[in-house]
């Protein structure tokens, strides 16, 4: 339970932290190369841009938290509550099985993130 609430610095985990953990745990279970997936798709989201805070309504969120919510909302076809992104994403992946593997999932997320960043420039 603590693992799902605090990071290594003792700060609360964000929705994108929880999502990343969920994705890479599934990659390992599926015998996919986590390091290769990280280098190919997730390392891009470690750049400073993704940690910058942006205001959405009366709430401040990192670009990474925003894109995880927008990505999921676009895939599900309706807005997802910013506090429930991890749970909704997990349910979507388990129930709908929209991707054959984590590689395909991260590829789609990475492409979506690159388009988002392009339009933020």
Where are these predicted regions, by residue range?
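Polyanionic (Asp/Glu-rich) segments that form extended negatively charged tracts
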Residues: 1-121
